[in-house]
């Protein structure tokens, strides 16, 4: 039998064209999604604007390759877990304050999520994500990974999108509080002035 060397029929051509269009559309949608996602946001803060170890100098927020959120917090001095413990009063902490509601006003509203670094002991940090629903203490929802960099002046905090409700976007600010002190002078914020930055996830 002679081999069929005829060109593809119109139906085959239409199927091939449809597949090519579908692939192009998928690539376009993926590119659009990546373009909509925020790149790394970096904020700096003046050195020496608060006293103590928890003087923030630089913070960044990004979406890591595994999909988790990655917040890097840099301080003026080296940091140890022991430096967050208090002999009296509240312990020290460094927190990402997160507003997930579309209409939230960070200048007048409390955040609804906190991703925080505290100390479990003299030699171990503790990370967690908390829900803020009222005037009481925040409710711990899940853990967050904490890593101290080689310089010991920066902490990297990683937490999942699901822990903050998978919003399309959120607003955030960073706050560190010196152990044993609740006065405004003991709190360092980035950005300053009660403002926040927007991070887009999708």
Per-region residue spans from a language model:
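Ser/Thr/Pro-rich, low-complexity mucin-like regions
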Residues: 150-194
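Bacterial N-terminal signal peptides
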Residues: 18-30
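Acidic, glycine-rich flexible loop segments
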Residues: 128-165
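N-terminal secretory signal peptides that target proteins for export/translocation
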Residues: 1-13
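Short, solvent-exposed mixed-charge patches
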Residues: 200-202
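Boundary at the C-terminal end of the N-terminal hydrophobic targeting segment
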Residues: 33-35
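Surface-exposed, glycine/proline- and aromatic-rich loop segments on solvent-exposed faces
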Residues: 37-126, 177-183
